[in-house]
Amino acid sequence: MKQELHHTLLGCGFRYTPAKQMPKGILLDTKSRRKGYYVKEYSTKGGVFVIALVLWNDPHIQLPFAYILQQPEQYKGRLLPHINFGFCLCYVTQMEADWNSNDLKSTYQDVDEQIQLTLDNSVASVESGTSNDVELEGEFSAYWQSEEELYLLAKPSRKAQLKAHLVEAELSSGSIRREYVAACSEQSEELVKWLNQRKFDESSLQEVSITTHCISVKPNRLAGVNWPPSCLREVLSWLKLVDYSAHARTVTLLMAKRTKRHILLFDVEGQDELAVYLELNLDVIGKRYFGRNAARKRNINNEAALLGGKFVSANFKRLGVTRADRDTLLSRNQLRPDVGNLSQKRIALIGCGTIGGYLAELLLRSGAGCGENYFHLYDNDSFKPHNFARHSLTAHNFGLAKSIALANSLKEAVHIAQSIKGIDRQFPIQADVLSKYDIVIDATGRPPVSKRLAAVARTLIADIRPVLIHAFNDGNGRASKVLVDDGR
């Protein structure tokens, strides 16, 4: 196998280079006597790129890592599509790709062609400098090289009054885990839940919150800019180059009030969000620049030059942005906005056993109990050790009421769960009770219950009659059946 692959790569124009003969100062092992790399020069319209292939233990199922040893001088420090950290060439999305793992020759010939194509496309993207660059579609944030993480519990917008906190937790190893989390003022309960579920100390919220600015960026170009920025001056230079309106808004927001700590949240059109944490040296800026008379004409360029000064930004960090708002959490189960969102439905789940236990978790992931309307779980049985093998609950819940234990488990699963209640009794099959729900799910597996529910539901007029869903296993689990009864 090694000989076949060796000759294939040589035939593609690679030369085998022992590790000890590789250039010094690169991020590859250059000391091992047993290692070596396959190196090739690729010519593009922008110049020559030198690529080293790093082969893995099983080249059949793992494509090689492409390391950039050398690139044209004019591209150094600039954003090139598919090139990250200045040395990593992303020529394929390996976890999504498909190839004939039993044909090494064809596979590695394709790898060679794909590297050439990727480099050509990357160079063409830089030269064209368009804003709707297909080579960077949805990937712009991947080149940000974030230093810490910011989680958003609310959708970012110019109208959203976001406040951020830096939270910390000490791990069992003694190391400290840190993250920034931003939420609206009305999300205080969700924020506390978030901290508790992620094992952070609530005392972090006692610190003064960090002013968070949401800034829309509509760039006139993406590729080819100096990237990533390492200070506030470089951020402002980037904005001035690609979107002067966003540049002016950023400067205005930073100069508007005397605040030391800021998070700039950039909503880049067609891309994921980017964020920056910074601390301003207010003494350097000077009092005369704050609270300026609105009637006086301001000079954005002068203020930007001041903010970009060497001693103005005392601390600067690039933050990776992760959305954790309600819509994002539930989006996988809502391919269409008008279908699948259960957060607006009043739901009763009757039976919290084998079917009901797992069903409750799936309902939560479709929004049940995550809005203003309630999600009620009914069961008068307790969770016992013999239930463990077929239930979603754990040994921690032995002896507890199934409905209450399951409801608590759901509420602890995610911070947006807010209207979930476990009721430790049988569901009262009465017309006035049924009318309080939009959906009633029968997971008891008992035909008498199903028949009675269907009969009583039909005594209600259509406007207040819930949809009945009967779910049960048949033949000791050989088949699962679901019957949806809308009363017609």
Kindly give the residue locations of the regions a language model identified.
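Compact alpha/beta protein-protein interaction domains typified by the UBC
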Residues: 23-92
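Glycine-centered motif in EGF-like
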Residues: 73-135
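Glycine/serine-rich phosphate-binding loop and adjoining beta1-alpha1 elements at the start
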Residues: 134, 139-345
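Hydrophobic/aromatic beta-strand patches that form the interior of the parallel beta-sheet core
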Residues: 263, 376-378, 423, 439-441, ...
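Glycine-rich adenosine-cofactor-binding loop
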Residues: 338-384
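Glycine-rich phosphate-binding loop and adjoining beta1-alpha1-beta2 segment
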Residues: 374-415
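A structured beta-alpha segment of the ubiquitous adenosine-cofactor-binding alpha/beta core
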Residues: 406-438, 444-449
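ADP-ribose/adenylate-binding Rossmann-like module
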Residues: 439-484
